[in-house]
């Protein structure tokens, strides 16, 4: 046992083999240092219990002395094989961190939950280890969890898909090429396939056929026209018109020189059938003339209806070309102009004479 002289009248026992025996030089070289800690100017005597019942010369802060006392008490309980109280096991924040000593006052009941109502009430439950609150009040200080923000709403389909995310896969349209067999136009079938469209009730493929009844009607007319072209080509080698069994002229044997078109227009043929009585109109008088004094005999009409008797240039050339083959009929009452059957005659010339005869009759009356 060595004795350390503090003053002339006081002697303090000092144990060199103590658990906390440190000399002053070792403390200066420790991590604490003298700059960061509040150091007592004089050695502070510390009275402990049991093995630590001795006085220490070395300077410690108040927080360090309290922590040493707590550890000494825990050690004493462990040696005596007694359960350590909960208050000793939980270290207060003030003792753990000396820097918070000035801001936080020491808790009188460190093992008790620190949840209060701000006045006198305080929770009586024990705190959770390494926390300040009990299990009930442990998460009260944290902000409440907010509800998860959902993405922008997109209306789902009946099939579970989304209208917003819709894939349109375009397919090339298929068009069947038209084929001509034996110089005849066959009905052309046009099939267009609409792209793979996914509507609100599911994905379906629609196929639209462009062949309708109206188009079939036009195609049938084209077939008739092609037959007429074929028959006119066969008849072009002969100069005599082809007549049917009942004595009427064939529809496709009537052709005019209309700028390279060997087929008479539908409107012109209708005028001949309706007004002039070419094909069996039954309106001829006893002189053999049709309405408006125009002859309707089949022999005379065949002279300008034949394919080889047409004049080049069409109706416009016939009007501009001077002609001296006009003969006035002997019938004074009708004053009808009739044309002798010459190769230069045409329906346009007949129509011109028809209008002149009508004007003469109106002036006579």
From Swiss-Prot:
Q: Where is the WRC domain?
A: 107-151
* Cell compartments where the protein resides: Nucleus
Q: Where is this motif: Bipartite nuclear localization signal?
A: 112-122, 140-147
Q: Name one GO molecular function term.
A: ATP binding
Q: Which residues form the QLQ domain?
A: 59-94
Q: Biological process (GO) annotations?
A: DNA-templated transcription; leaf development; regulation of DNA-templated transcription; response to far red light; response to red light
| GO cellular component terms given for this protein | nucleus
A Pfam family that this protein carries is QLQ
Q: Where is the composition biased (Basic residues)?
A: 137-147
PANTHER family recorded for this chain? Answer: GROWTH-REGULATING FACTOR 5, GROWTH-REGULATING FACTOR 7
Function as written in the Swiss-Prot or TrEMBL entry: Transcription activator that plays a role in the regulation of cell expansion in leaf and cotyledons tissues. Component of a network formed by miR396, the GRFs and their interacting factors (GIFs) acting in the regulation of meristem function, at least partially through the control of cell proliferation.
- Annotated protein name in UniProt: Growth-regulating factor 7
Tell me the organism: Arabidopsis thaliana
Supply the gene name.
Answer: GRF7
